[in-house]
Amino acid sequence: MKSIADTGFIVAFARSNDQHHLWALDLGKRITEPLLTCEAVLAEAAFHLGSSSYVLSLVEDGLLRLAFDFSENLGQLRELARRYADHKPDLADLCLIRMSELHPRHAVITVDEADFRVYRRNKRETIPLICPPQGN
């Protein structure tokens, strides 16, 4: 499964009391290759979990792989920030939108379906998503 990991998935995977924990665990069992992500997502996840060490271990253990160069994509990130200014996307979301453009065969794993249904890659393409079932 070729995918890009958002913060909410990582937090749900780690926290047994998260409403999406069982979904994240089930999905995690089916992952056969590292999930791509970016530093902004790792920083958010470490903040929400209160543990940089746990997030670092996910990278060290090969569940997550950093696959984004912020500096090389600064112009595109700035354009995305302008395009979605009314939605006030955080930096991690902007990076994930751009990663989806760079890795078009990858779906974004997120619990934040509402925002990602609004965002578009390459200006008009919907971003393929893997989300928890409705009501979960």
Language-model features: locations:
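Metal-dependent nucleic-acid phosphoesterase active-site entry motif
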Residues: M1-D18
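Histidine- and aromatic-rich ligand-binding microenvironments
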Residues: K2-D6, L36-C38, P89-D90, T126-N136
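PIN/NYN-family metal-dependent endoribonuclease catalytic core
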Residues: I4-A5, W23-S51, G62-D69
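Alpha-helix/helix-capping structural signal
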Residues: G8-F9, A40, A114
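Residues that scaffold the ATP/ADP-binding catalytic core of kinase and kinase-like folds
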Residues: A12-A14, S57-L58, Y119
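Short helix-capping/linker segments at secondary-structure and domain boundaries
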Residues: A14-H20, S51-V55, E101-I109
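Active-site neighborhoods of divalent-metal-dependent phosphate/nucleic-acid chemistry enzymes
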Residues: A67-E113
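Acidic, PIN/NYN-like endoribonuclease modules and their adjacent C-terminal/linker elements
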Residues: P104-N136
